């Protein structure tokens, strides 16, 4: 089975500013999906979200989630990560994660700005622990 420590999968997920599409189950059972900024860290997918958002409340209630990251031009590719999340409100971890996300998606010069803005009370660090990883890194082959 593929996993996030596979160098090719890790490189694909960590390249540039690709967003992930995170899926979860709403309270009424509907599947929901939204784009997120994310990091690959210690064999997990890490992102932040508001504790009182639909996503934050849903993941607190039901930790099952799936992430899909894709390449939308040739050679077309995707990685899907299925698993369960853990949530943290630790302020140091939150500030660190928010700063690292800011660096990846907005550039090093704006990392601290995004860390201050998003690493605040009421936000969560979400860590997706993979139970299954599916990857197709060259769909034209």
Predicted segment positions?
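Short His-centered aromatic/hydrophobic patch
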Residues: 73
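Residue-level signal for well-ordered alpha-helical positions
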Residues: 58, 62, 139-140
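Extreme N-terminal tail/first-helix region
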Residues: 1-17
């Amino acid at each position: 089975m593929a996993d996030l420590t596979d160098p090719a999968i890790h490189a694909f997920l960590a390249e540039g500013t690709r967003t992930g599409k995170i899926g979860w189950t709403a309270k009424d059972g509907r599947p929901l999906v939204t784009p997120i900024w994310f990091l690959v860290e210690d064999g997990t997918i890490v992102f932040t979200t508001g504790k009182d958002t639909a996503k934050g409340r849903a993941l607190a209630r039901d930790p099952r989630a799936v992430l899909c990251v894709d390449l939308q031009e040739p050679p077309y590719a995707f990685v899907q990560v299925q698993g369960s999340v853990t949530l943290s409100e630790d302020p140091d971890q939150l500030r660190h994660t928010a700063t690292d996300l800011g660096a990846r998606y907005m550039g090093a010069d704006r990392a601290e700005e995004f860390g201050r803005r998003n690493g605040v009370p009421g936000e969560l660090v979400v860590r997706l622990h993979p139970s299954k990883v599916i990857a197709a890194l060259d769909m034209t082959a």
